[in-house]
Amino acid sequence: MTLKDLEIGKTAVVTVVGGEGALRQHFLDMGVIPGVSVTVVKLAPMGDPMELRIHGYELTLRLADAEKILIDESSVTKSDGKREKNTKNVFKENAVTEHPGLGEGGRFHQKADEHPVPKGTVLTFALAGNQNCGKTTLFNQLTGSNQHVGNFPGVTVDSKNGQIRNHPDTLVTDLPGIYSMSPYSSEEIVTREFIIKQKPTGIINIVDATNIERNLYLTMQLLELDVPMVLALNMMDEMRGNGGSVRINKLESMLGIPVVPISAAKNEGITELINHAIHVAQYQEKPSRQDFCDENSHNGAVHRCLHAIMHLIEDHAVRAGIPVRFAASKLVEGDQLVEQALNLEQNEKEMIEHIIVQMEEERGIDRSAAIADMRFSFIQKLCDQTVIKPGESKEHERSRKIDAVLTGRYTALPMFAAIMALVFWLTFGVIGAGLQNVMEIGIDWLTQKTDAVMTLWQVNDVLHSLVIDGIFNGVGSVLSFLPIIVTLFLFLSLLEDSGYMARVAFVMDKPLRKIGLSGRSIVPMLVGFGCTVPGVMATRTLPSARDRKMTIMLTPFMSCTAKLPIYGFFTSVFFPKQSGLIMIGLYFLGIAMGILTAVISRKTMFHGEAVPFVMELPNYRLPGAKNVLQLMWDKAKDFLQRAFTVIFMASLVIWFLQTFGLHLSMVADSKDSILAAVAGAIAPIFAPLGFGDWRICTSLIAGFMAKESVVSTLSVLFGSTKTLLEVLSPLSAASLLVFCLLYTPCIAAISSIKRELGTKWAVGIVLFQCAVAWVAAFVVHLIGMAILALIE
């Protein structure tokens, strides 16, 4: 019987984990090991993937992958759908004993074990932990930085650095969230390469106390790296609030490192954590325990195997700069990257293989499963002695009730459509549009007053034109769209922080698979509605190069907020009564073009299937007001910086080129300017689309630098909407809107694509987007001309 055959609400014991390669290793690292109990919670609305409960947390798995996992049919029982409460752990001592201070208790901070680094050395820390465990929140508390804090696995897609507050000789690096040190995704490779090669003086390992079994799996692998380390036990407020507790001192002694209970969100325990982290790094107090094998389990088969390999490869590991215990574990798992780094001789490889095969025969399961089982067995023993699990937490109970609607069979897709429609309606029709009108009034008033004052003072004509036509008309026209952009980012942030984005990935996996993508691809594309740059960076959470390339190619089709000024400007001038409807239609057109591109690409460039959908579903959490407000401010600040740097400079350059002729003298008519001569050369390319005017062409070129520059350039070149109406018809405006929707993303987005995929892909995407935009705009223009001909 396979896991695929297990009915909803039933629990069974896993007997065999099938599959091969990195995917199977990922299953094992996620806790899907022989002997573990697994419960089927539900199926996605379209019947695939399934949601499982294992080790006390929720995991998603496709049916095709579940079919590779065998279960014991005789072990099938009915589950009540709630997390089990640990009632057997009743400790004599107080389970919430306060963590000992510096110099108190245990082996930690004893001079005999200290090897201090030279004074003045910058203490570098790697902040490592599972995805969605509060890692970036802790980073913000430690450093005062304000990184994006989300509730979706993989928010940190790049490492970020910062000094610990009030400790200038420190540097903390926030690494991508990972589940293990196996090379399944690029994030895991980045994290382990950083720790092994950069050799930080200390590791801060953050663990979610409400999901401690899952999180400690990574902890055990970090301990094998033999780097001074402190464990930050996060979300202890939730743990205690739900009736659970942890024996901190006992946990500390069993792991061999300091353990500090904290609440990153409430800034509790952070000072103590900093003190311990700095101390273990300053005095290089390495973990006192790395060997978690039970010598009595299965006659110590795994224990003897690992120690034999450690003895054999010790010299190689030292030369390669890889901790020997870590190297031995990875060799048993079949990690090719570690094997290559060790540069073993052929006879040594054969000896290692013989040792591993002997262990498999004694243990009764394969090598990778044996290592995973060794770790989870120790974690189970550890938790039995140190953790009192609460019953179903308030957060989990709330999540179950919300999921009944948001991921329900008949309600999930309608709710997703309704939520996105509400976001767009509030952004373009209510909140954002209302605030935009207020800002436009303010900018117009300031422009008129400045113009009047400069006229009264008889300011030089060139300077007058520069300030009014170049700066106010250019930058001011873009600034008025700030409220819409911030509003859209606000709603996207709320969806991400709450945990809903992960559910969208779960719900959309099957339809996305039809076009060759995984459900995880939906998140970079949704982020792309805010900005293409983080959308492209978010693809690093995808483990397959094929999926990353395909998702990056589609992300620019998701209309970013920088294009909103273009839509708002043209719809207000040419289609004032249908403004909101047309803008929403443009968004859906972009999605449709992305789907069409995906379908074609799947049959040409990207053959094969999307990677398996294995993802943890976090509990819903109310977004923190501070986090949301900070994100809004960051986006507003970023927009203002762009407005007064890139857009400001673009406006000045455009003003200069359209004000002066080839002999650098002011021209009476801009058609005699330098700009007209340059842009006129490419204008014929756009003539079939209905907007062959050189000024339009100039604005599109400026849009390559920053999409907001399209509007500022048009404002500078045309001066007034009346002039624009004389040049463009509503049909031409519609064609231009479609072109702006689909043509090449800005230079920042192209740079991020180049960083992820290389120069050839970046250039290819620019040319591809421009070609698609030209064809789509041409089709719109042809259809419009045909309709007008029929009407006449």
PLM regions: where:
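Conserved G1/Walker A P-loop phosphate-binding module
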Residues: 97-180
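Conserved C-terminal guanine-recognition region of P-loop GTPase G domains, centered on the G4
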Residues: 167, 190-259, 566
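Canonical P-loop GTPase G-domain recognition
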Residues: 239-292
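Extended helical scaffolds that flank P-loop GTPase cores
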Residues: 283, 290-457, 663-675
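Extended, low-charge hydrophobic alpha-helical regions
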Residues: 369-373, 389, 430-471, 515, ...
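Hydrophobic core segments of alpha-helical transmembrane domains in multi-pass membrane transport
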Residues: 415-426, 488-493, 571-573, 586-600, ...
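Juxtamembrane inter-helical linkers in multi-pass membrane proteins
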Residues: 441, 445-449, 502-532, 607-631, ...
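Transmembrane helix-loop junctions at the membrane interface of multipass transporters and ion channels
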Residues: 561-584, 748-758, 779-792
